[in-house]
From Swiss-Prot:
Gene that this polypeptide is encoded by: prmA
Species in which this protein is naturally found: Clostridium botulinum (strain Eklund 17B / Type B)
Identification of the protein by name: Ribosomal protein L11 methyltransferase
Superkingdom of origin organism: Bacteria
Molecular functions (GO terms): protein-lysine N-methyltransferase activity
InterPro entries with a match to the protein in the record: Ribosomal_L11_MeTrfase_PrmA, Ribosomal_PrmA_MeTrfase, SAM-dependent_MTases_sf
Catalytic activity: L-lysyl-[protein] + 3 S-adenosyl-L-methionine = N(6),N(6),N(6)-trimethyl-L-lysyl-[protein] + 3 S-adenosyl-L-homocysteine + 3 H(+)
One term under GO cellular component: cytoplasm
Amino acid sequence: MNGVWIEVRVITSCEAIEPISGIFYGLNSQGVAVEDPNDLLTRDQGPLTWDFADINVLEHKGEFAVVKAYFSGDDDLEKIVSITKEKVKEIQEMGIDIGKGIVECDKIKEEDWANNWKKYYKPSNITDRIVVKPMWEEYSPKNEELVIELDPGMAFGTGTHETTRMCVKALEKYVEHDSTVFDVGCGSGILAIAAAKLGAKLALGVDLDPVAVESAKENVGLNDLDNIEILEGNLLDVIDGKADIVVANIIAEIICILTDDVSKALNKGGLFITSGIIHERVDMVTSKLDECGFEVMEVNKDGEWNCIVAKLK
């Protein structure tokens, strides 16, 4: 590799950060960094302080975000860029605003990568009670804060996206000490980890992607939890028994496909917490939930995204 990395960048909208990050994880990138002007502001409020005043994207607050991925210098740059462009177009066809949708690339020296990408990740309050921190950062919990430790270099981001925040807030509200929680499409495992830290009797994370499963298992290890398990496969194929809560932070189309299986995996009166739903897809999801025997209890909004909490009748 000769100390060289490939950096691929997508200039996009804040709405598309999560799905575009997913593209890069699917391409087995070695790490992903996000420059979001809405997050990377120097701010003094609250116990956590960010100091990103040197980042030029601050001049464009709210206009666009930049998602960067890093690959080995030995990887096929032309192929990576071609697939990225194709996948970005697919995201746009799903109705997600991709903003400029510009794909760029560069080759950078290894020392630049090593020194640059970690500076974007600092401890962050995703709710009033829960803090997510990268594994290399020190953080002392305040009062009754719960700290989730992640390795964001492995896959699936830092857990600060709006959809993740809303799911965690819902888990805070509904998880009880005798709860069994299934996290479907678990990615980094952050939602299963949050459920376990909130006191669930058992949290199970499930994902079809072996990279996600490896990432989630590593993150579970970082948090030293014994009331959580990560499994590879489809929900009903790999999980025995039923849950009190199923949480899925995916996209609306996949949620609709999953809903019937989720109804079979829940105890009567159990809750389905789901996010990754843009405004234009809310009616589609609520209609499918009704069709599968759910009563919609909450539709929460954060930015361009929605989180639905539904109860199995």
